[in-house]
Amino acid sequence: MRAVFITSITGWIACVLIGLEILLPYIFRKNRLSVWLRTAANAASAPYLKRLWPHYWLGYLLLVLGVIHTVVPMQAGHLRQWNLTGLWIATVALLLLLLQGALGLWLQDPKLVGRALMRSWHYWLIFGIVLLVGVHVWLNG
């Protein structure tokens, strides 16, 4: 019973934090959203990559939550009661999340060559992760 609770809590917290994680780069950049949210004044206070520190740490937290959400039910051993397709989809989403974390680490380097391509991959990976997590929640939530 405790494993189900921990798995459920970490999964739903991660779902909410994924949405926040996606919003943070847009909040820390001067645009219509940051003006509307009144965060635009902070958007020019430091270099963009330095302002993104909450985005970085939230990404690390999402990795930890994803691993906990994966390991706890595996150790409990009650996986047969869940939709196996949803579990495989969640496995692919976790692997993409690990790749996303690696790309995020590279993107923190201000001297990175090919930043535009890496940011594009970073964007499309989160799109894929959100899609896979949504299907996982639909099948197993």
Give, region by region, the residue ranges found by the protein language model.
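Membrane-embedded alpha-helical bundles that constitute the cytochrome b-like, heme-associated redox core
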Residues: 1-141
